[in-house]
Amino acid sequence: QEQRLILIYDFKQDLNAYLAASAPAQKVRSMTELVAFNKVDEREKVWSQDLVEAAEATSGRDDPEYVEALAYAKRKAGPEGYDKAFAYGVVAVVTPTGQPAGLIPPPGTAGHTISARPKGSSPPSPSMYAALAGYPNLTVPMGQVEGLPVGLSLIGPKWSEAQLLAMAY
């Protein structure tokens, strides 16, 4: 649950900063405008807007809910997570990067609209926890699932980028 909270709070803050600094020709300049655009644009009706709308409803990174979720996730990622493995001499944690993306049937075919996955149904991402703990994460191609690419992550202790690159090569 904390992963989703961190995602939606950070998504709003970071996307608003990006859009505000984007080229003047860019029509969508904020998350609020993105939500409005997605509700009107037919191409966007394929996707559930739950995460975008949840992000838009957040209040900011000083919200106690966000602060608590971030502190919990950092603790679980670092001292209670990857740090323990690295303390035992593990050189790299090897894990799938995340779950595969969903297939989108071509427009005009049965099942073109993608149903929203129930909230909280996605497994936690090892990549996000590595980022929270400040650990490098190198992703390499692992294969395909239903014709879509999937990745394999090599997560190492701080400053192990050279070793991870050597392993991946």
Per-region residue spans from a language model:
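Short helix-loop capping/hinge segments that flank enzyme active sites or metal/cofactor-binding pockets
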Residues: 6-78, 141-149
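Structural helix-boundary/capping segments
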Residues: 17-21, 126, 131-169
